[in-house]
Structures are given as structure tokens and as C-alpha cells.
């Protein structure tokens, strides 16, 4: 699947703790597209990215996603709703 990501999303994934080698390779091969990048992901890679981002989403006492982790929440939603996932 091809997943368009913003520069902020790309940078957040790159900076995530415990970034697996399989995703490092995906980021290294990402194609620039105007304001961001296109990630070319297999199903396994998309699942790994979804799991990594899910682990980095945090909520406040009201159950709302915290502003500093919203970028990960947006990626989870983009992957989960992608027609090729």
C-alpha cells in the first residue's frame, strides 16, 4: 500500500522509540511528494507502523488524545481506514 504522510508524521515515526529495522528501511526508501512523503508498505510493514504509532498515542484524564501524540493518532487512523489495509 502507498501511504501519504506529512513531514511531521514522517519525523515523528523516525524519532519514535524502538523503531524496528523493517520500518527504518521503509523510511529510508520513502518518496518525497510535495509537502511530505509516500511510504510504500507491505501488509506486514503497515501493521508494524500501526502498532508503533498505537503505542505512542496517549490520552489525558478525559480520554482525549494529547496534543503531542496527535500525530501518531492521525497515522493510526490513516492506516486503519486505508482501502488496501
Q: Where are these predicted regions, by residue range?
A:
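Positively charged, low-complexity terminal tracts
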Residues: 1-85
